[in-house]
Design a protein with these regions (language model features):
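Short, basic amphipathic alpha-helical segments that act as recognition/interaction helices
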Residues: 5-11, 28-32, 40-64
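Short amphipathic alpha-helix starts
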Residues: 15-32
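Short, positively charged interaction helices/loops
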Residues: 55-88
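Detector for repetitive beta-architecture
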Residues: 69, 74, 93, 99, ...
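Compositionally biased, non-globular sequence tracts
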Residues: 128, 134-139
Length: 139
């Protein structure tokens, strides 16, 4: 039971930091294009390149997400959401392509009682205690 987009929830970052290794020549070519004004900086160049590649594979991504029954975008689980599930004797299997966020006031016990499994392709934001409690249920 995810919270609709218009309800209040904590602000989450719009991106996740990653580290990549590039060959010296590739990096030099990026720097050359940046210095010639093709892009504002390395990050802008790499983001654009990634978006272009994802755009070329959009159909494949959409079909795979549908086949794996992944929810696309942001899914936020508040304490009230999970308490309602618990009180109804229900659990949830979370399948997200994007960001799954569990409220900071959710206890590890409540998460264990209500989240049967969690699959996130992207990022999972939850307290360290909740992540540890759900450890074996995170795929």
């Amino acid at each position: 039971m995810a919270v609709p987009a218009n309800e209040d929830r904590p602000k989450v970052p719009e991106s996740e930091k990653i580290t990549i290794n590039l060959g010296f020549v590739d990096l030099g070519q990026i720097d050359l294009l940046v210095s010639d004004g093709s892009r504002a900086n390395r990050t802008d160049f790499i983001r654009t390149a990634i978006r272009n590649q994802l755009g070329r594979h959009d159909e494949v991504v959409r079909k795979a997400a549908a086949r794996k029954q992944l929810d696309l975008g942001l899914r936020y689980f508040s304490r009230a959401d999970l308490e309602a599930l618990r009180d109804a004797g229900q659990t949830v299997n979370v399948h997200v392509l994007g960001l799954a966020s569990i409220a900071s006031d959710v206890s590890p016990q409540l998460a264990l009682q209500t989240i049967e499994s969690i699959t996130v392709l992207g990022a999972l934001h939850a307290s360290p205690a909740v992540k540890a409690a759900l450890g074996e249920r995170i795929r």
